[in-house]
Amino acid sequence: MSRILMSQLTHPQRVRLLYKTILRLHRGLPAELRALGDNYVRDEFRRHLKCNPMEAQLFMTEWARYASTITQQLGIRGKPKGELGEEIDPKTVEMLKDDQVVQLYELMLAAKGVEDAQGK
């Protein structure tokens, strides 16, 4: 069977392929991070089902970058880094919407296993 080029796939097929690839990569994470990551990815992909084309392009680019980063960090291609995650540039945080900052903060707390002030 010949390999299908990404350019031959429809947009929904590319989205599904990226989604499935990320979930497969998460199999290499510790169990608690895998569950957190899988839920987050599922929610984000659902949330962006009906976004405009410009947002969709940015969404796909950023998630493809995430997949590439986690591939390197898990050592699937090349030498493993031995650590997961990366620092977020303060300029990037400044560009986020308020709800995105809250979501990022909640994700950080969940990843560290810390409860917020509301006991969540």
UniProtKB/Swiss-Prot annotation:
Superkingdom of origin: Eukaryota
Protein biosynthesis listed as a keyword: no
Biological process terms in GO annotation: mitochondrial respiratory chain complex II assembly; response to oxidative stress; succinate metabolic process
Residue interval of the organelle targeting sequence: 1-36
Entry GO CC: mitochondrial intermembrane space; mitochondrial matrix
Keywords: Chaperone, Mitochondrion, Transit peptide
Subcellular location: Mitochondrion matrix
Major localization listed first in the record, in broad terms: mitochondrion
Pfam families: Complex1_LYR_2
Effect of disrupting the coding gene: Reduces the SdhB protein level resulting in an approximate 50% reduction in SDH enzymatic activity.
Keyword Transit peptide recorded: yes
InterPro entries the UniProt entry points to: SDHAF3/Sdh7
Listed CDD domains: Complex1_LYR_SDHAF3_LYRM10 (cd20270)
Function of the molecule: Plays an essential role in the assembly of succinate dehydrogenase (SDH), an enzyme complex (also referred to as respiratory complex II) that is a component of both the tricarboxylic acid (TCA) cycle and the mitochondrial electron transport chain, and which couples the oxidation of succinate to fumarate with the reduction of ubiquinone (coenzyme Q) to ubiquinol. Promotes maturation of the iron-sulfur protein subunit SdhB of the SDH catalytic dimer, protecting it from the deleterious effects of oxidants.
Record-stated family: Belongs to the complex I LYR family. SDHAF3 subfamily.
Known partners and oligomeric status: Interacts with SdhB within an SdhA-SdhB subcomplex.
Name of the protein this chain belongs to: Succinate dehydrogenase assembly factor 3, mitochondrial
Lineage of origin: Eukaryota, Metazoa, Ecdysozoa, Arthropoda, Hexapoda
Name of the gene this protein is made from: Sdhaf3
